[in-house]
A protein has these predicted regions:
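Acidic/glycine-enriched connector segments
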Residues: 2-3, 8-138
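Intrinsically disordered, low-complexity segments enriched in serine/proline and basic residues
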Residues: 140-154
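Positively charged, lysine/arginine-rich intrinsically disordered segments
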Residues: 133, 155-156
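N-terminal intrinsically disordered, low-complexity tails enriched in polar/charged
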Residues: 1-4, 142, 156
Length: 156
């Protein structure tokens, strides 16, 4: 049984791509998604049609004291959703580009070492698996590398 995340931009227009993905999944897959319009609702509907289980994450909007807490609750929901997944499919729209909650979900998947496949609307797909995204500055692990080198040299 695999937990497959299906997330995406509200402005993503290729409903068939989302539905084709859901249809292609093994029967024991569980779709993990949110209740957002577009990609998430299409995935949920197609999962129901194909008798696949769907786990829908919604933000906890109870006990909110100010409107500034609302985005935090949505990002918390996104974290919980991604943490539940074994693999994430993220759909990026041409119009909206790489932004918002979908961007956060992809970055969080990378951070937590959950493999992700990015479906760019009208372009080729990209699989991201435990590596830096191209827009991140490359991290230098110089101190760790030197420490490892010297500890091995001293061991001889």
């Amino acid at each position: 049984m695999n937990f497959i995340g299906v997330v995406g931009a509200r402005k993503f227009n290729d409903r068939k791509a989302v539905e084709d993905l859901v249809v292609s999944l093994p029967k024991d897959s569980i779709i993990v998604t949110s209740g957002c319009k577009g990609v998430c609702t299409w995935a949920k509907a197609k999962a129901a049609e194909k008798d696949l289980e769907a786990l829908v994450f919604s933000p906890d909007l109870s006990n909110i004291r100010s409107r500034f807490e609302i985005p935090k609750r949505y990002y918390q929901r996104n974290c919980e959703l991604i943490e539940k997944c074994d693999f994430v499919h993220a759909f990026i729209s041409k119009e909206g580009g790489y932004s918002g909650g979908t961007r956060f979900e992809i970055e969080y998947a990378v951070k937590t070492r959950i493999p992700a496949k990015v479906h760019w609307e009208g372009r080729m797909d990209e699989i991201i698996y435990q590596r830096q995204l191209p827009f991140y500055p490359e991290k230098q692990f110089c101190a760790a590398a030197w420490q490892n080198f010297f500890s091995q040299a001293v061991a001889f």
